[in-house]
Amino acid sequence: IELVKFANPLDENSLLQITASDGYNFFISMDEVYENSELILSIQDVGGNKSFNIVGAESPKAWVRGVVELKVIATNILEIQGKSNHPFSFNPSEWVNEMDSTFVRLGDKSVKLQGVALRALWIYAEPEPNSTDIVISSESQVIKLNSKEFNDSDEIRLFTYLDEEGMEFILGRMNGEVLLRNVTSMEIK
């Protein structure tokens, strides 16, 4: 999308957030914005009503109709460490194709968020054979989950929430339940 390239985003770890008129949000990595020549913002004119659509994205989830906003956002990085053969820094821009969306309850409102299955992060980290738990922390709270609670399902996810104040990681379930807000670290035990 030449329009986004023209804005000259400074951070290579940024994401392009696409917002549709129905509230749907999806991310496209800036790598894809720069490298995918098939990615376009198309204009559709039906009966004098114009709408914009994103087409050509690598993920079919990013083919968004009724685009009302394109925003380049800086991403946060979350360290996933501990008893792991492959500790890594979770960067949402590298996991876009693994994300699914659902409405998550944040206080008195529901917000549609993208999230990666905790199981996928666990597998990618290659836990040591005797590892059974993951400790997930925020500045004020700690949750310990046994891998049996998430290894057979993609229900528990690490969601990415964006607002005027920046990016926040939220641990939650696909049914919208929030387990922990403002996640700051994950440690495999």
Model-found features: residue ranges?
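N-terminal intrinsically disordered, low-complexity segments enriched in P/E/S/T
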Residues: 1-189
